[in-house]
């Protein structure tokens, strides 16, 4: 008998989230990407609160990137997110939740850009 445990992407998402739950004391930086947009949120899972967010839908990003999701637009989103995280107290270390996406392309570009601003994950 064969059991369908979901698609490959759903299994990867579950596997990544399970590993993240082990370190639930830290805040979680969650990303979502589509073919047209890139979204980032800093979430506290204990109280279910979002502290900061940034995306390619914001005016600063749309004006510079012409509604394209590429490494340039992701770098601008990383800059926006780092500015918002610097305003918060004690948010230099968190968990990077890549979700169902592989750590290549714009996901790794975003992570490296945030690390260059002094954040640890």
Curated annotation (Swiss-Prot):
Keywords: Ribonucleoprotein, Ribosomal protein, RNA-binding, rRNA-binding. The keyword Transcription does not apply. GO terms for cellular component: cytosolic large ribosomal subunit. Signal peptide: none annotated. Coiled coil: none annotated. InterPro entries: Ribosomal_uL18_bac-type (IPR004389), Ribosomal_uL18_bac/euk (IPR005484). Transmembrane segments: none annotated. Gene3D superfamilies: 3.30.420.100. One of its GO terms (biological process) is translation. Pfam families: Ribosomal_L18p. CDD domains: Ribosomal_L18_L5e (cd00432). One of its GO terms (molecular function) is 5S rRNA binding. It comes from the Bacteria. The keyword Plastid does not apply. PANTHER family: 39S RIBOSOMAL PROTEIN L18, MITOCHONDRIAL (PTHR12899), LARGE RIBOSOMAL SUBUNIT PROTEIN UL18M (PTHR12899:SF3). HAMAP family: Ribosomal_uL18_B. This is one of the proteins that bind and probably mediate the attachment of the 5S RNA into the large ribosomal subunit, where it forms part of the central protuberance. Part of the 50S ribosomal subunit; part of the 5S rRNA/L5/L18/L25 subcomplex. Contacts the 5S and 23S rRNAs. Belongs to the universal ribosomal protein uL18 family. This is Large ribosomal subunit protein uL18.
């Amino acid at each position: 008998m064969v059991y369908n445990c979901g698609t490959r992407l759903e299994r990867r998402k579950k596997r990544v989230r399970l590993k993240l739950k082990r370190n639930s004391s830290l805040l979680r930086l969650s990303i979502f990407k589509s073919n047209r947009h890139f979204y980032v949120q800093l979430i506290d899972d204990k109280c279910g609160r979002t502290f900061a967010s940034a995306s390619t839908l914001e005016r600063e990003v749309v004006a510079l990137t012409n509604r394209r999701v590429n490494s340039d637009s992701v770098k601008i989103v990383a800059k926006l997110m780092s500015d918002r995280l610097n305003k918060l107290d004690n948010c230099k270390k968190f968990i990077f939740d890549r979700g169902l996406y592989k750590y290549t392309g714009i996901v790794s570009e975003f992570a490296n850009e945030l690390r260059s601003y002094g954040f640890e994950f």
